Amino acid sequence: MIRKLAALIVAAAALQACAVSDRLSYVGQTPPMTPIQNPADLAGTGPSQLPMPMPRMPQQRYATNSTANNSLWTANSPTFFGDPRADQVGDIVTVNIAISDSAQLNNTTNRSRSSAEDSDLTSFLGADLTGFFNDNIDPTSMTSLGSTSSLAGSGSVNRTESISLTVAALVTQVLPNGNLVIAGRQEVRVNNEVRELLITGIARPQDIGSDNTIAHTQIAEARISYGGRGHLSDAQRPRYGQELYDILMPF
């Protein structure tokens, strides 16, 4: 048991050491910004494997109507000059993120239970046992068991979140049914703090507006992360020793 606990402490310390080394790398400097990368290489944004219908035939990006060669209007374009909406790998689509959520929960639990058991041993198979025991034992009260348990708990959650952002995402994959897998990242550095926004998900081409924008509520399997790194984020985090203590302390 002691060896397992020691191994757990060493593993947790190794993980914390990696995080500490990253923070030590820019002591006295502003936190570095990551270079431009392929959004498909971000964690969790690889090729998606989802239940799909039969693949559709690929459509031309700017199809023309062969039966009306003299017409200036194309059959598959919602605008007069063409369709600016993203529909191929590498295209860019603008995602409007407007989150305004609130949740309020109140839970109360009360439980109590008691039990009692008494037994005597004054006779056995018709034989009187009152004289079998010495004077220190009362055969009318051989065993007496009792238990009492109670539980009282309460919990409440009152949370309000509001985020309003706009980020450009890249189409990283076109699924067989035509849906688009998108991924985007945006970094903004202000003084010694880097704010990072990540978004991934699956969008329908029909939900993309004529201005090539889509709301985050129309993205399936959406993963939105808004955080940062720097001096302010470090000040809000507990010390790694305290984190280890909270993880390993069983009481």
Curated annotation (Swiss-Prot):
The keyword Membrane applies. Its main location: membrane. GO terms for molecular function: cytoskeletal motor activity. Keywords: Bacterial flagellum, Cell outer membrane, Lipoprotein, Membrane, Palmitate, Signal. Pfam families: FlgH. Residues 1-17 form the signal peptide. It is a lipid-anchor. A lipid is attached at residue 18 (S-diacylglycerol cysteine). InterPro entries: Flag_Lring. One of its GO terms (biological process) is bacterial-type flagellum-dependent cell motility. A lipid is attached at residue 18 (N-palmitoyl cysteine). GO terms for cellular component: bacterial-type flagellum basal body, distal rod, L ring; cell outer membrane. It is found in: Cell outer membrane; Bacterial flagellum basal body. Belongs to the FlgH family. Assembles around the rod to form the L-ring and probably protects the motor/basal body from shearing forces during rotation. PANTHER family: FLAGELLAR L-RING PROTEIN. The basal body constitutes a major portion of the flagellar organelle and consists of four rings (L,P,S, and M) mounted on a central rod. This is Flagellar L-ring protein. The lineage of its organism: Bacteria, Pseudomonadati, Pseudomonadota, Alphaproteobacteria, Maricaulales. The gene is flgH.
